[in-house]
Amino acid sequence: PFRPRCPLAYDRCVTEEPALEHVGVEHSAACHRSAELVDVGIELYEPTWVDTADFADAQAPEPAVLAAAHNGAATARPAGEPADGRVMQVTNLVKHFPIRGGGLIRHQVGEAHAVCGVSFDLHRHETLGLVGESGCGKSTTARTVLQLLKATSGSVRFEDQELTTQSRKDLRPLRQQIQVVFQDPYASLDPRMPVGDIVAEPLRIHDRWSRDKGPKEVSELFRMVGLNPEHRNRYPHEFSGGQRQRVGIARALALKPEVLVMDEPVSALDVSIQAGIVNLLEELQDRLGLSYLLIAHDLSVIRHICDRVAVMYLGKIVEIGTRNDVYDRPTHPYTQALLSAVPVPDPVVERQRQRILLTGDVPSADNPPSGCRFRTRCWKAQEICEQQDPELTERGQGHPVACHFPEVTAVLQTR
């Protein structure tokens, strides 16, 4: 039954359904090629033949070829490779929300400290991932960078232009260069509009639509994201979740932006569909030279697609570095706790490894702890952690970390 979507299908798969057979200790699979593939390690989300092949003419590669491709240059750009240049710079970004009391006048009685002094750079053709627990300020950071929320203080520069001081009129041409892909493909598309009109809407808003070229551009955008242009007159409810997200990506690409801000673009999709969207994003980045600011809580997605990773806790970045730095050499206790919750695809190692269980609840952003914000849940906390907020700086561990007692601990160990 999986044959129509399988990259390794061959003639026998058409005529005979495979039986569920043992391929290892406590491991069974219903596949005619299980014996060939049992020793080929394929990571989740790795690009496969199915992503690039022409199904009409191509033949499936032999498992040995597939293994060689996997063990070779599977990703287009190694983690930590210098990018082409800085396209966006965020410095000491702060966003506080007023808390108002009850009554008729509703005086302000406090502030919610959603984002507090966040700084990072985004380079051309780079993917920067923001990770952290729900409520840590990831989405608020993205909305403030996009100027959908007015920053309390701080700077957001895009190609040497300061965005926080621009008027709505001046921001209009700049918004064409920074587009957004939303989390929920069911809520981000107007159910009353055909998907072709949804994709064309940015072109019409920014006066870039022409009767002659417009339909061709929309058709090309559909092909670019793997959709059939003949379906552009259908409505969103006629598409699956993955197809709707592809429509959202096509809409974001309509104005030929340089930066895509993506707020958990695959979290609402099934795992099998997530892989296709992630591979599509990588292909588009390589083809168009895009820069991504990716917000996600799925650490496996972040590890696959991101060049650099920033870990947020209660409105602050506590650790930032290349993908390999953060995943292989985590330094901040909070990063180590997050990574310890990631399942390891090895039953023996998974049973032997120790989880880092955090005690207590996440403090309220209305009244954050003094000093280090993580100290109320940290097993290393000492007096200095209560008195002094650690700066995000390189402390001899190879990448910046905001901790008074940084220590590299390999959490994701495999055999």
Describe each model-derived feature in a short phrase.
Residues 154-162, 174:
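Conserved ABC transporter NBD signature motif
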